[in-house]
């Protein structure tokens, strides 16, 4: 059975100067700005800093308001929560939100991912073992196989499982009733979902990048749970280099904590945070070596673009999917990159950040 994680909710508590890119990063073995989830040597601490209720979840106010209404309405009618699709860049809290939904509804949850559901029996085994009201979270749901999707259609709409028994002319469909459940799907590529699957979600919500003040609160909350002293300025320094992503903020916090401990610093101040993050090649705007390499390729080798995605991937050593889903969204968000039908172009702001003179200003100097 393809269950990655299955947890029962605990009782409710009693009531979050720019430099040119160098040829190689100082710390090449760990990509501290990659928001993909990774196996942490301190997995228990990673779990402990996850918020468990809406009251602890910082940011995403619009999303929380929508889900709060949906939860209260479902509870008042004694119904299960409608199926929910969460989409947005990685590391913004989609999995955490699914756990919070289970906590707020007072039900259990099961966590899996689409690549783990390769065979029909994988999803069947999950569905038949769901209890009434359970939440089934499927990460990377856009990667579901066609056969798995077709099994989900009647399960989502009518809470039944249609199984084909026999072969050829003697084949028949047998329907097995399922407990009413809530499917929460998460994806970074909502456009890659098929229309039949997407249309079966009653709620479709986007998670946005976080503001610096929200990330500062997250850093301070996590620091307290990790028993690390961080000043307000230190938290802000970490936050503004975190690419608007909580997962990155927490990861940078741990690396800064390590640096402060080795340097025998009683607390993480702004200066200590800046020194540590400089070691990891994270600049004041949150760009790492790969970001700067991308911009450098576009500006220096292709006069600002447009440049094709495959060319950028070859120049940086990253695959195209990672560039599209991890690096480009943030570069576009801060106005350093434009994506056109002909390729990627560097903006005027990117030129200035990288220490180059924009082309139009070069002409004015002639």
Curated annotation (Swiss-Prot):
InterPro entries for the chain: AAA+_ATPase (IPR003593), AAA_lid_4 (IPR041445), DNA_helicase_Holl-junc_RuvB (IPR004605), P-loop_NTPase (IPR027417), RuvB-like_N (IPR008824), RuvB_C (IPR008823), WH-like_DNA-bd_sf (IPR036388), WH_DNA-bd_sf (IPR036390)
Region feature Small ATPAse domain (RuvB-S), mapped onto this chain: 211-281
A Gene Ontology molecular function term of the record: ATP hydrolysis activity
GO BP field: DNA recombination; DNA repair
Organism: Nostoc sp. (strain PCC 7120 / SAG 25.82 / UTEX 2576)
Top-level enzyme category: hydrolase
Domain comment quoted from the record: Has 3 domains, the large (RuvB-L) and small ATPase (RuvB-S) domains and the C-terminal head (RuvB-H) domain. The head domain binds DNA, while the ATPase domains jointly bind ATP, ADP or are empty depending on the state of the subunit in the translocation cycle. During a single DNA translocation step the structure of each domain remains the same, but their relative positions change.
Keywords associated with the record: ATP-binding, Cytoplasm, DNA damage, DNA recombination, DNA repair, DNA-binding, Hydrolase, Nucleotide-binding
Reactions accelerated catalytically: ATP + H2O = ADP + phosphate + H(+)
Region listing for Head domain (RuvB-H), in residue ranges: 284-366
UniProt protein name: Holliday junction branch migration complex subunit RuvB
Protein task: The RuvA-RuvB-RuvC complex processes Holliday junction (HJ) DNA during genetic recombination and DNA repair, while the RuvA-RuvB complex plays an important role in the rescue of blocked DNA replication forks via replication fork reversal (RFR). RuvA specifically binds to HJ cruciform DNA, conferring on it an open structure. The RuvB hexamer acts as an ATP-dependent pump, pulling dsDNA into and through the RuvAB complex. RuvB forms 2 homohexamers on either side of HJ DNA bound by 1 or 2 RuvA tetramers; 4 subunits per hexamer contact DNA at a time.
Subunit structure and binding partners: Homohexamer. Forms an RuvA(8)-RuvB(12)-Holliday junction (HJ) complex. HJ DNA is sandwiched between 2 RuvA tetramers; dsDNA enters through RuvA and exits via RuvB. An RuvB hexamer assembles on each DNA strand where it exits the tetramer. Each RuvB hexamer is contacted by two RuvA subunits (via domain III) on 2 adjacent RuvB subunits; this complex drives branch migration. In the full resolvosome a probable DNA-RuvA(4)-RuvB(12)-RuvC(2) complex forms which resolves the HJ.
Intracellular or extracellular location(s): Cytoplasm
EC numbers for this chain: 3.6.4.-
SMART domains for this protein: AAA
Region (Large ATPase domain (RuvB-L)): 13-210
Disulfide feature: none
A GO cellular component annotation in the UniProt record: cytoplasm
């Amino acid at each position: 059975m393809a269950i990655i994680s299955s947890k029962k909710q605990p009782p409710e508590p009693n009531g979050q100067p720019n430099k040119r890119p160098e040829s190689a990063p100082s710390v090449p073995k760990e990509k501290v700005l990659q928001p993909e989830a990774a196996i942490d040597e301190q997995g228990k601490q990673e779990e402990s800093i996850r918020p468990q209720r809406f009251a602890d979840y910082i940011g995403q106010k619009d999303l929380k308001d929508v889900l709060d209404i949906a939860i209260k309405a479902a509870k008042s009618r004694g119904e299960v929560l409608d199926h929910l699709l969460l989409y947005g860049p990685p590391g913004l809290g989609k999995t955490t939100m699914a756990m919070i939904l289970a906590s707020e509804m007072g039900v259990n949850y099961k966590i899996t991912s689409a690549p783990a559901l390769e065979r029909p029996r994988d999803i069947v085994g999950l569905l038949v073992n769901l209890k009434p009201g359970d939440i089934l979270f499927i990460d990377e749901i856009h990667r579901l196989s066609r056969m798995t999707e077709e099994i989900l259609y009647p399960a989502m709409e009518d809470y039944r499982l249609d199984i084909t028994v026999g072969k050829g002319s003697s084949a028949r469909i047998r329907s097995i009733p399922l407990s009413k459940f809530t499917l929460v799907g998460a994806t970074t590529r909502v456009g890659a979902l098929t229309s039949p699957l997407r249309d079966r979600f009653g709620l479709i919500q986007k998670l946005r990048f976080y503001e610096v003040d929200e990330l500062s609160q997250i850093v301070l909350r996590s620091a307290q749970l990790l028993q690390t002293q961080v000043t307000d300025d230190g938290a802000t320094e970490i936050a503004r280099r975190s690419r608007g992503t909580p997962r990155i903020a927490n990861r940078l916090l741990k690396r800064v904590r390590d640096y402060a401990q080795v340097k025998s610093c009683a607390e993480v101040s702004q200066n200590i945070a800046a020194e540590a993050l400089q070691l990891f090649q994270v600049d004041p705007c949150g760009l790492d070596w790969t970001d700067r390499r991308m911009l450098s390729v576009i500006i220096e080798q292709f006069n600002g673009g447009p440049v094709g995605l495959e060319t950028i991937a070859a120049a940086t050593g990253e695959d195209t999917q990672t560039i599209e889903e991890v690096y480009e969204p943030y570069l576009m968000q801060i106005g350093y990159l434009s994506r056109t039908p002909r390729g990627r172009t560097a903006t005027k702001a990117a030129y200035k950040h990288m220490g180059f003179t924009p082309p139009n200003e070069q002409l004015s100097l002639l």
